[in-house]
């Protein structure tokens, strides 16, 4: 009886570790340098974009936190998107990537190269993008897949009313499809034929 109880307790403990392992795997997949160069060479409908993702604020217990920069390769020093993601485990077993914008973001352009990115910034100075969180789950094959919820992510870019994001994240690539729609559901920005395919490159900056 005692042995059975110990086995049951060990089983419960091991099951509680699985979600955290998924979070760690997701962050490991996300962190790095990515490029859509291969896709852009094959299809002129896509730009050659570079994506940098690094862990930040590693001593905080409410993360992991990730800083991202996204730029057309010809304008690497002038990124068109800078965000902070907070990765959290949900009670239903899924993972949530909460999205924050940065006030005056260009002052931090290139911070991904530093040993301690966004050192002069704190979470309470970020602006949460309500409704823009991406909810992810881990597929049986090991990759992660997720999307924003319904029309909850507001956007006024190029006449949009809301935006959607769909992602697939694997250990060597990431597919992201960001689109904006007007109030009638017509797409007004973003790729039309499918998501951007970012291949992971060797990241010489990030220390695991």
Question: Model-predicted segments: where are they?
Answer:
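Generic secondary-structure boundary signal with a strong preference for alpha-helix termini
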Residues: 14, 44, 183-184
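Bacterial Sec-dependent N-terminal signal peptides
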Residues: 1-21
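N-terminal glycine/threonine-rich, aromatic-flanked beta-hairpin/loop signature
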Residues: 51-79
């Amino acid at each position: 009886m005692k042995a059975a109880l110990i086995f049951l307790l060990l089983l419960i403990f091991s099951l509680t570790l699985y979600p955290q392992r998924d979070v760690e795997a997701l962050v490991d997949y996300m962190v790095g340098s990515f490029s859509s160069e291969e896709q852009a060479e094959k299809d002129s409908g896509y730009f050659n974009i570079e994506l940098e993702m690094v862990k930040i604020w590693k001593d905080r217990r409410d993360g992991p936190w990730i800083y991202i920069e996204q730029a057309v390769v010809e304008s690497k020093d002038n990124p068109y998107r800078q965000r902070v993601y907070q990765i959290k485990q949900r009670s239903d077993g899924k993972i949530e990537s909460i999205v924050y914008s940065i006030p005056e973001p260009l002052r931090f352009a290139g911070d991904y190269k530093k040993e301690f990115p966004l050192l002069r910034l704190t979470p309470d100075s970020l602006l949460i993008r309500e409704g823009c969180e991406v909810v992810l789950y881990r597929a049986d094959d090991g990759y992660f897949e997720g999307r924003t919820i319904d029309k909850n992510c507001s956007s006024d870019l190029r006449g949009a009313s809301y935006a959607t994001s769909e992602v697939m994240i694997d250990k060597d690539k990431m597919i992201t499809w960001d689109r904006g729609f007007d109030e009638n559901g017509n797409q007004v920005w973003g790729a039309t034929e499918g998501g951007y395919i970012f291949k992971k490159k060797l990241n010489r900056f990030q220390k695991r």
